[in-house]
Curated annotation (Swiss-Prot):
It is a multi-pass membrane protein. Pfam families: G3P_acyltransf. It comes from Caldanaerobacter subterraneus subsp. tengcongensis (strain DSM 15242 / JCM 11007 / NBRC 100824 / MB4). This is Glycerol-3-phosphate acyltransferase. The gene is plsY. Probably interacts with PlsX. InterPro entries: G3P_acylTferase_PlsY. The keyword Lipid biosynthesis applies. Catalyzes the transfer of an acyl group from acyl-phosphate (acyl-PO(4)) to glycerol-3-phosphate (G3P) to form lysophosphatidic acid (LPA). This enzyme utilizes acyl-phosphate as fatty acyl donor, but not acyl-CoA or acyl-ACP.
Length: 198
């Protein structure tokens, strides 16, 4: 029963969509109607710029941190892992926004940095490096998620943590499936390219 409660609580925390809330109350727009249509920090960056995206990113990271800490408090590491997946699912598919949320990257950063700070930091550094080199946020995001999963293979903690890392990476990749198509076609937007607000 505790596992279910932790999962539901973490999911609801994830459903607090900071991109939607921030842009709705500061610009009176639904961020999902602009740019990529994604309710996440990257799309806020693309549409409104870094000053608007920064608080959204930080708050999304904190969602992951809070959910994992709550899960760990109630059930230990198994609870942390369940909460980590659930909070990302809440961010991606928020019930309050008709299941149209973000892609879970910033929230995943908070999750992995709380579960395994060292491996999380390495994965984050590699992801950021890919973004800096290629200018593709999507490619860096997927690279970071895959790196975290691979690191858990080479530096195993437990089967549960490895399974968690693989599931998390699959969630990130799944949410970027349209980006993958655009990357292949050469039409993916690079960081710094701004979308127009009509």
């Amino acid at each position: 029963m505790k596992f279910v409660l932790v999962a539901v609580l973490a999911y609801l925390i994830g459903c607090i969509n900071n991109a939607y809330i921030f842009t709705k109350y500061t610009r009176n727009i639904d961020i999902r109607n602009y740019g990529s249509g994604n309710a996440g920090a990257t799309n806020v960056l693309r549409v409104l710029g870094p000053k608007a995206a920064a608080p959204v990113f930080v708050l999304d990271v904190l969602k992951g941190v809070v959910a994992v800490l709550l899960g760990k408090y109630f059930i230990g590491m198994p609870g942390a892992l369940i909460a980590g997946i659930a909070v990302v699912c809440g961010h991606n598919w928020p019930i309050f926004l008709k299941f149209r949320g973000g892609k879970g990257v910033a929230t995943s950063v908070g999750v992995v940095m709380t579960i395994n700070p060292l491996l999380g930091l390495i994965a984050l550094a590699i992801g950021v490096a890919v973004i800096a080199i290629t200018r593709y946020v999507s490619l860096g995001s997927m690279t970071g998620a895959i790196t975290f999963a691979l690191l858990n293979i080479f530096f195993p903690n437990s089967v549960q943590v490895l399974t968690f890392a693989i599931v998390l990476a699959l969630l990130v990749i799944f949410q970027h499936r349209s980006n993958i198509k655009r990357l292949i076609n050469g039409t993916e937007s690079k960081i710094g390219q701004r979308a127009q607000i009509k």
